[in-house]
Amino acid sequence: KWDATEALKLIEQEKITNVTGVPTQSWEILSHPEREKYDISSLEDLGGGGAARPAEHVKQMDEQFEARPSIGYGLSETNALGTLNGGDEYLQYPSSCGRVVPPLTDINIIDENWNTLKEGEVGEVVIKSPGNMVGYWKNPEATAEVFNDDGWFKSGDLGYFDGPFLHIVDRVKDLVIRGGENISCIEVEAAIYEHSDVLEACIIGIPDERLGEQVASAVHLKAGVELSQEDIQKFLAGKIAAFKIPFEVRFFKDPLPKIASGKFDKPALREIFSND
């Protein structure tokens, strides 16, 4: 099981040069209250993948670590091949997961009818690569749902291109749809992370009789800090559209629940919000 303290010990003991995991793991190293006790000067790169890294975290990692942050995008079904972003370009485009990895990978943005969208238009990310899986084991129906006849794989992610840089908006299934408006959890989380007292933030949709869904946020603060729901809402005013500001904010004394990979456990959080 992931433990930031154990990670710091191992980095010091083994003179580790590269740490790659989901962005919450590198953030827990950065924000660890006893980080200065450990010699982690051997680190050269703090990689990330599997989830978005807020732009504010990229900035803080660059300021506080000699190691350069980097991030990639890919899926198990593509053998993790997709895009890479690191070095100075990552600092210039911190909300992007980077450029397509040449010459192995092609990435396109499509609508629901497999039509290619223009630069800047949001649609589903599809990937074609020799690294793509052949199919899901003994599940031809599921395989047929994600591949077209030309070998393009549907990722289940929404994104867009800004020049050569791919931006992931959200998982299709994780979008909050409030009164017909699609709200990116990643965008709202990134805005909350700009607050200096926030350690963790996770956005989910909760049922609403009138609007279908409302935006809700689970927040874990730095030790000794107290904030109210109104504090978070006021902080976000002007940073994101009013309809994207969380209707409900709950504060957790302990770190937010996560699955084995280190990603936030959104089903568990939805259950917590629905039961209280």
Report the location of each language-model feature:
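AMP-binding/adenylate-forming catalytic core of the ANL superfamily
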Residues: 11, 19-22, 113, 129, ...
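Hydrophobic beta-strand positions
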Residues: 109, 256-257
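Adenylate-forming AMP-binding core of the ANL superfamily, especially NRPS adenylation
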Residues: 52, 85, 92-138, 163
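Gly/Ser/Thr-rich phosphate-binding loop
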Residues: 8, 13-21, 30-92, 102, ...
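Active-site phosphate/pyrophosphate- and oxyanion-stabilizing loops and adjacent acidic/basic residues
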Residues: 27, 59, 95, 141, ...
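Structural motif
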Residues: 14, 33, 65, 105, ...
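Active-site glycine-centered loops adjacent to acidic/histidine catalytic or metal-binding residues
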Residues: 50, 74, 98, 157, ...
